[in-house]
């Protein structure tokens, strides 16, 4: 069973995240941030990873701490659920359209955390959600999941569509990269014999 639960509590947030990499895409996101919950629901649905997120944060300050800390906890949960990464496909490339928007997401589930994020949002906010927090979430997720992640919106005009294409692109890339490759016969997909360094 490739599952994990992470609990993270600070003075700013109290978060519990559970993932099942071999799930069916069931989502249960409750962060108190409507748009963010929508993105997490998309992530679960299109990755086919079951994701439960319960978060209580200092939303009276702003959405930054909750968004970033959910990224941290979700990344840690994915990393823990992957274990030694034996048998995974490891790499994936996705082009994700959303109406006028097209985003490219490339992932290497390598144990080597890195993020390249290139997306220009026409607006500062989507509803009450600061668009700069999209990058903050991806940074927190990539660093804590231990993945190399390149996210680039090639073009787009609507901020909601841009954010959605980024999350859906990650979802489909994760779905492919963490899938078990029957040709590897359970081997770690690296000439080093291990991933993570």
Swiss-Prot record:
Its EC number is 4.2.1.19. Pathway: Amino-acid biosynthesis; L-histidine biosynthesis; L-histidine from 5-phospho-alpha-D-ribose 1-diphosphate: step 6/9. Its main location: cytoplasm. It holds the Pfam family IGPD. Keywords: Amino-acid biosynthesis, Cytoplasm, Histidine biosynthesis, Lyase. It is an enzyme of class 4 (lyase). It catalyses: D-erythro-1-(imidazol-4-yl)glycerol 3-phosphate = 3-(imidazol-4-yl)-2-oxopropyl phosphate + H2O. It is found in: Cytoplasm. InterPro entries: IGPD_sf, ImidazoleglycerolP_deHydtase, ImidazoleglycerP_deHydtase_CS, Ribosomal_Su5_D2-typ_SF. CDD domains: IGPD (cd07914). The keyword Lyase applies. One of its GO terms (biological process) is L-histidine biosynthetic process. One of its GO terms (cellular component) is cytoplasm. It comes from the Bacteria. One of its GO terms (molecular function) is imidazoleglycerol-phosphate dehydratase activity. Belongs to the imidazoleglycerol-phosphate dehydratase family. This is Imidazoleglycerol-phosphate dehydratase. It comes from Rhodopseudomonas palustris (strain ATCC BAA-98 / CGA009).
């Amino acid at each position: 069973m490739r599952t994990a639960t992470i609990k993270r509590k600070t003075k700013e947030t109290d978060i519990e995240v559970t993932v099942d990499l071999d799930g069916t895409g069931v989502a249960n996101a409750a962060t108190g941030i409507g748009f963010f919950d929508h993105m997490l629901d998309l992530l679960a649905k299109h990755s086919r990873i079951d994701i439960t997120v319960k978060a209580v944060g200092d939303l009276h300050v702003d959405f930054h701490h909750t968004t970033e800390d959910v990224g941290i906890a979700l990344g840690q949960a994915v990393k823990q659920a992957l274990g030694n990464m034996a048998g995974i496909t490891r790499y994936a490339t996705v082009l994700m359209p959303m109406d006028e928007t097209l985003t490219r997401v490339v992932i290497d589930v390598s144990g080597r955390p890195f993020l390249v994020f290139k997306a220009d949002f026409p607006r500062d906010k989507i509803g009450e959600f600061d668009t700069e927090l999209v990058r903050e979430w991806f940074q927190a997720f990539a660093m804590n999941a231990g993945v190399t992640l390149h996210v680039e919106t090639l073009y787009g005009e609507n901020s909601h569509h841009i954010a959605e294409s980024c999350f859906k692109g990650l979802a489909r890339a994760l779905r492919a990269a963490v899938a078990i490759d029957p040709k590897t016969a359970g081997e770690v997909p690296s000439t080093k014999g291990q991933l993570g360094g």
